[in-house]
């Protein structure tokens, strides 16, 4: 399969923007799953890592932007069905099921767990500022 064939087949894959899974966004702003199941601020790389964990073929497109908010750059294309119409992963048949699975995996992503550990220890420091009484 040459590059042209691959590119044309990727065009038929489903698109997942990080906004679809972002719990900080409203439905009007583009979230596609319930806020209780969504995760805060997912990235394209985290979504792609979750797709590879779920054994779903995917392609990251970092040069593409979300149409409603063009400051949010990046999207992931995923292949849910093979050419014959059968699902790639029998446990995941629809795009919504895939988005829910990814949203469950993103908070457990190794990049997030490493970021949160140092932040928790550094915020437990002393508080600065004047603590005197205010005059009436």
UniProtKB/Swiss-Prot annotation:
Lineage of producing organism: Eukaryota, Viridiplantae, Streptophyta, Embryophyta, Tracheophyta
Gene Ontology CC entries for this record: nucleolus; signal recognition particle, endoplasmic reticulum targeting
Effect on the protein of changing residue 31 to Q: Abolishes RNA binding
Family as reported in the entry's similarity comment: Belongs to the SRP19 family.
Disulfide bridge partners, by residue number: none
Protein name: Signal recognition particle 19 kDa protein
Keywords, alphabetical: Cytoplasm, Nucleus, Ribonucleoprotein, RNA-binding, Signal recognition particle
Domain of life of the organism encoding this protein: Eukaryota
Region (Disordered): 106-136
Function: Component of the signal recognition particle (SRP) complex, a ribonucleoprotein complex that mediates the cotranslational targeting of secretory and membrane proteins to the endoplasmic reticulum (ER). Binds directly to 7SL RNA. Mediates binding of SRP54 to the SRP complex.
SUPFAM superfamilies reported in the protein's UniProt record: SRP19
Localization in the cell: Cytoplasm; Nucleus, Nucleolus
GO molecular function: 7S RNA binding
Assembly notes: Component of a signal recognition particle complex that consists of a 7SL RNA molecule of 300 nucleotides and six protein subunits: SRP72, SRP68, SRP54, SRP19, SRP14 and SRP9.
GO biological process: SRP-dependent cotranslational protein targeting to membrane, signal sequence recognition
Organism: Oryza sativa subsp. japonica (Rice)
Gene: SRP19
């Amino acid at each position: 399969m040459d590059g042209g064939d691959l590119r044309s087949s990727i065009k038929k894959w489903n698109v997942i923007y990080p906004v679809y899974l972002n719990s900080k966004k409203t439905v009007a702003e583009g979230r596609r799953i319930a806020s209780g199941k969504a995760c805060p601020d997912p990235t394209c790389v985290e979504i792609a890592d979750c797709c590879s964990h779920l054994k779903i073929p995917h392609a990251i497109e970092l040069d593409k932007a979300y149409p409603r908010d063009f400051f949010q750059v990046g999207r992931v294309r995923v292949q849910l069905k093979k050419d014959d119409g059968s699902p790639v992963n029998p446990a995941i048949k629809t795009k919504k099921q895939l988005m829910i699975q990814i949203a469950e995996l993103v908070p457990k992503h190794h990049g997030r767990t490493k970021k949160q550990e140092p932040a928790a220890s550094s915020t437990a420091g002393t508080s600065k500022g004047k603590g005197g009484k205010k005059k009436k």
